[in-house]
């Protein structure tokens, strides 16, 4: 019985340490995360911070603050996704790269292709890659993606309609 209690004590001590304390004994969970001050981005040990950073980046992108949003996404790119899909992260990275003041079409295309390599039916990446192909004078490739988008999302979807209207 003593052995069992000792084992339980050791396991509970180990688990509580790994659940959110740093080497100084301070809790890293809760509202006061240092991830926003860390140039490397959120810690891979704190999935909540990764999710918060991802959604913060999305909000910045929606507010057309593309460079700021992209920087955050780059900081969490290598982290394990929590509350989102990696394909979505790459889709937003592509969108922000393409929409910023000085668009980086090469990076944007690579991000969209990464998203599609993870999810070949990613509707956002299909639409936005089609827009990129149109913007870079590759209309045949854009039309090919329009056809694929029609199959995956349907011709009545907003994504299909937006790309269709751009091409016609």
At which residue positions do the language-model features occur?
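Conserved structural position within tetratricopeptide repeats
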Residues: 78-81, 113-117, 151
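Canonical tetratricopeptide repeat
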Residues: 92, 128, 162-166
């Amino acid at each position: 019985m003593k052995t069992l209690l000792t084992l339980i004590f050791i396991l509970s001590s180990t688990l509580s340490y790994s659940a959110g304390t740093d080497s100084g004994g301070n809790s890293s969970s809760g509202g006061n995360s240092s991830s926003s001050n860390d140039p490397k981005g959120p810690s891979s040990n704190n999935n909540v911070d990764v999710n918060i950073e991802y959604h913060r980046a999305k909000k910045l992108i929606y507010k057309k603050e593309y460079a700021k949003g992209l920087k955050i996404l780059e900081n969490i790119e290598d982290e394990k996704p929590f509350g989102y899909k990696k394909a979505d992260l790459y889709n937003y990275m592509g969108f922000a790269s393409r929409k910023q003041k000085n668009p980086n079409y090469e990076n944007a295309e690579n991000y969209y292709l990464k998203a599609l390599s993870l999810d070949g039916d990613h509707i956002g990446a299909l639409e936005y890659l089609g827009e990129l192909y149109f913007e870079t004078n590759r209309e045949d490739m854009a039309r090919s993606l329009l056809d694929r988008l029609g199959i995956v999302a349907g011709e009545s979807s907003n994504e299909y309609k937006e790309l269709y209207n751009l091409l016609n």
